[in-house]
């Protein structure tokens, strides 16, 4: 997905290349960010692995993999999953066939993945992707698409209310109303990140609402409310509660990322 959070086979001591995802020179701040990103992602991965009872013998789909292989935090979940004994598939709207060479054992599938052509998937993992899929409706639909593939999904995303925006590397501006934030980004020449199609940051409240709505709509489509349900005063909002677990790692003093595991 279009993000400068890119990487290659992860290890905390891996050399960071001199250029970022868009071909620009990497600064010392970028190098620190990538090392910190790797540590935070490892925290989220360990939490995810524990929440699903280990990944050995399980089949995981990495949804929204980046084609980048130059940075230490890119596709790190894929490597860790393979090392821990999972069967891993990957899919992306970008060309990622070369990742099968980078990560032996990985199987790349066409995008968008057809659930009917996939083996049974235990969990879909989407790392730092949902903030890049578009507006609120598109983010809900993205979650629904993932829920159509597996009974549980895990999403990670930067926290909108961390004081630093890791995409633009600007502090605090992203706390403004979205329209004002985008207007300032355009003034600063950051037109790519000013487009909602490329970046829509989420808070925990935003993400919880999105996943709740996506699960509710998925359940409604699969099992419509009957007259008997209505007679009992039940609706989709009153059915079994959604099973949602959170991980909120911190960086530079506050929650930097959100990871949510959703079971339907």
Where are the predicted features?
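Class I SAM-dependent methyltransferase Rossmann-like catalytic core
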Residues: 8-54
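Short glycine/proline- and acidic residue-enriched helix-loop micro-motifs
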Residues: 30-31, 187-197
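Soluble or luminal CAZymes and related metallo-dependent hydrolases
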Residues: 36-44, 69, 134, 138, ...
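Conserved SAM-binding loop
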Residues: 52-53, 58-163, 260-264
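Conserved class I S-adenosyl-L-methionine
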Residues: 152-181
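Short alpha-helix
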Residues: 194-215
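Conserved S-adenosyl-L-methionine
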Residues: 215-232, 239-249
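Core SAM-dependent methyltransferase catalytic element
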Residues: 237-264
């Amino acid at each position: 997905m279009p993000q400068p959070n890119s990487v290659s086979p992860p290890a905390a001591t891996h050399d960071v290349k001199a250029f970022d995802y868009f071909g620009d020179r990497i600064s010392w701040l970028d190098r620190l960010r990538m090392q910190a990103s790797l540590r935070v992602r490892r925290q989220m991965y360990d939490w995810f692995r524990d929440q699903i009872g280990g990944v050995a013998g399980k089949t995981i789909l990495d949804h929204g993999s980046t084609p980048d292989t130059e940075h230490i935090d890119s596709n790190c979940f894929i490597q860790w999953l393979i090392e821990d004994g999972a069967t891993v598939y990957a899919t992306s709207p970008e060309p990622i066939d070369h990742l099968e060479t980078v990560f032996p054992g990985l199987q790349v599938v066409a995008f968008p993945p057809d659930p009917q052509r996939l083996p049974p998937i235990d969990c879909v993992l989407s790392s730092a992707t949902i903030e890049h899929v578009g507006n609120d409706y598109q983010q809900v639909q993205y979650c629904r698409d993932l829920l159509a593939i597996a009974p549980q999904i895990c999403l990670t995303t930067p926290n909108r209310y961390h004081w630093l925006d890791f995409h633009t590397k600007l502090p605090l501006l992203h706390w403004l109303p979205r329209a004002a934030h985008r207007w300032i980004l355009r003034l600063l020449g950051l037109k790519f990140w000013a487009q909602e199609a490329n970046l829509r940051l989420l808070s925990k409240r935003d993400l919880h609402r999105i996943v709740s709505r996506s699960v509710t709509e998925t359940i409604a489509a699969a099992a419509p409310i009957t007259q008997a349900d209505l007679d009992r005063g039940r609706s989709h909002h009153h059915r079994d509660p959604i099973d949602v677990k959170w991980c909120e790692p911190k960086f530079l003093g506050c929650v930097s990322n959100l990871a949510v595991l959703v079971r339907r």
